[in-house]
Amino acid sequence: MSRLELGKEAVALLTLYEEGVKSLAIVDTLRSARQEQYRKHRMPWFLLQTRLQVRVIESAQLGMLPMPIPELLKEAVAVQPLNLNGIAHSSSSINSFLLFE
């Protein structure tokens, strides 16, 4: 294997490692947020996860870059009115679609 090939392989492995570290950091942040959110507001994890997904999808539809995870979490846990079934309502049609699926 030539030095060039070894260099390319090393760069690829380093990139994979960096992406893995970022992914682990995101998972750790979400896990911490999940525990803290449940402790504070007793919000079920699936509802927090759904709200996060909605924020990411809405950002993509608007052509915006995804927000950093801490900002997404702040928006996702924002208090929203609940209906009689305990489901959050929003003016966004995608929110309604995802929450009822």
Swiss-Prot record:
Protein name listed in UniProt: Uncharacterized mitochondrial protein AtMg00260
Source species: Arabidopsis thaliana (Mouse-ear cress)
Entry GO terms, CC: mitochondrion
Location(s), subcellular: Mitochondrion
Keywords of the record: Mitochondrion
Further remark: A stretch of 270 kb of the mitochondrial genome is duplicated within the centromere of chromosome 2 resulting in the duplication of the gene. The expression of the duplicated gene is not demonstrated.
